[in-house]
């Protein structure tokens, strides 16, 4: 995946999604260009 930032927190960018995949252990997210940024990086 592509990296992205929620403030200073690095995450993975999911294009076209508006919620994070539930099976990857993400603890947070923020809206990102045409999608969502989910962290922490797995």
UniProtKB/Swiss-Prot annotation:
Q: What intrachain disulfides are recorded?
A: 4-37, 6-30, 20-38
Q: Which InterPro entries match?
A: BDS_K_chnl_tox, Myo_ane_neurotoxin_sf
Location within or outside the cell: Secreted; Nematocyst
- Main location, first listed in the record: secreted
Taxonomic classification, please? Eukaryota, Metazoa, Cnidaria, Anthozoa, Hexacorallia
Other remarks in the entry: Negative results: does not block human Kv11.1/KCNH2/ERG1, Xenopus laevis Kv11.1/KCNH2/ERG1 and human Kv1.1/KCNA1.
Does Cell membrane count among this protein's keywords?
Answer: no
What are the GO MF terms of this UniProt record?
ion channel inhibitor activity; potassium channel regulator activity; sodium channel regulator activity; toxin activity
- In its UniProt entry, what is this protein called? Kappa-actitoxin-Ael2e
Query: Which family is this sequence assigned to?
Result: Belongs to the sea anemone type 3 (BDS) potassium channel toxin family.
Q: Indicate whether Secreted appears among the record's keywords.
A: yes
- Print the domain comment field: Has the CSbeta/beta fold, which comprises anti-parallel beta-sheets stabilized by three or four disulfide bonds.
Q: What does this protein do?
A: Inhibits voltage-gated potassium and sodium channels. It potently inhibits human Kv10.1/KCNH1/EAG1 (IC(50)=1.1 uM) and Kv1.4/KCNA4, and moderately inhibits rat Kv1.3/KCNA3, human Kv1.5/KCNA5 and human Kv2.1/KCNB1. Likely to act as a gating-modifier toxin that binds to closed Kv10.1 channels and reduces their activation by shifting their voltage-dependence in the positive direction and suppressing their current amplitudes elicited by strong depolarizing pulses. On sodium channels, it blocks rat Nav1.4/SCN4A, human Nav1.5/SCN5A and displays relatively weak inhibition of mouse Nav1.6/SCN8A.
Query: Which keywords annotate this record?
Result: Disulfide bond, Ion channel impairing toxin, Nematocyst, Neurotoxin, Potassium channel impairing toxin, Secreted, Toxin, Voltage-gated potassium channel impairing toxin, Voltage-gated sodium channel impairing toxin
Species name: Anthopleura elegantissima
Q: What are its GO cellular component terms?
A: extracellular region; nematocyst
Gene3D superfamilies in UniProt: Anthopleurin-A
